[in-house]
From Swiss-Prot:
It catalyses: 2 D-alanine + ATP = D-alanyl-D-alanine + ADP + phosphate + H(+). The lineage of its organism: Bacteria, Pseudomonadati, Pseudomonadota, Alphaproteobacteria, Hyphomicrobiales. Its main location: cytoplasm. It comes from the Bacteria. Transmembrane segments: none annotated. One of its GO terms (molecular function) is D-alanine-D-alanine ligase activity. It comes from Rhodopseudomonas palustris (strain BisB18). It is an enzyme of class 6 (ligase). Keywords: ATP-binding, Cell shape, Cell wall biogenesis/degradation, Cytoplasm, Ligase, Magnesium, Manganese, Metal-binding, Nucleotide-binding, Peptidoglycan synthesis. This is D-alanine--D-alanine ligase. Cell wall formation. Pathway: Cell wall biogenesis; peptidoglycan biosynthesis. Binds 2 magnesium or manganese ions per subunit. ATP binds at residues 130-184.
Amino acid sequence: MTKRKHVAVLLGGWSSEREVSLRSGKACADALERCGYQVTRVDVQRNIGTVLDQLKPDVALVMLHGRPGEDGTIQGVLETLGIPYSHSGVLASALAMQKDLAKTVMATAGVPVAEGLTLSRAEVAKRHVMAPPYVIKPVADGSSVGVFMVTEAHEHPPQELFRDDWPHGEQLLVEKYVAGKELTCAVVKGEPTGVIEIVQTNKFYDYEAKYSPGGSNHILPASLLPFVYQEVRRLTLAAHVALGCRGVSRADFRFDDRIEGTAGLICLEVNTQPGMTETSLVPELAADAGITFDELVQWMVEDASLGR
């Protein structure tokens, strides 16, 4: 009798995205159990190295969002323990999480990125560092956590930036606001998926819009001219390759269709640990490509390796 592969689904953690990680992890663990795997759900705490060393799984499916699962930390632990794992490796994870550095790498590879500055929280809190409208975001956080938009010159910088218990780090990325359609595309099995257009009532695709049922509407395929649609797909794969990503990644874009051709297309960021909840984008994009949720999760496990 063939031994069932033992998969440790790493979920939870201590980042601001813990709740989403728990939901992603549960959905994937349930899928793996349906597929016949032996599954252990591991809520990641700071003793994770000891826990995994004792557990000795065959594979780790990383379903962590934010630190320590998306910044290269958990990947380094898994490399040290010799446990094959899913998604991107140490370097690509750390690089993609550090938004300012990721932008530099993508721009060098010909992927258009938003104009922006990396500054201290104190600098951003005391004055307009560029003419509004602009977006303020943590250098190293995801799921639109800690993101603010300043639209008018008479507005003061967000008061939250003055908080003594500000949890999102002292370095902030301030980017010129890019108007237009919100688009997203993923890389699955080494190929770009279709493109989703995200329509929501909020100013930007924030945490609530991403993870609350009905928080946004998804148009798939996105209502774009064919050459623009294909350019989004091309740039998604180019960004994935430039950052050294592996497994599944997702790239987010804005497209201002008032600008001729594809000049209004801007890549906002690449997510190396995209959500896998019931409202997440990657499962929807995979389904459009004929890949069921269970098939997608099983592929992530079978694709796992070291040295990613």
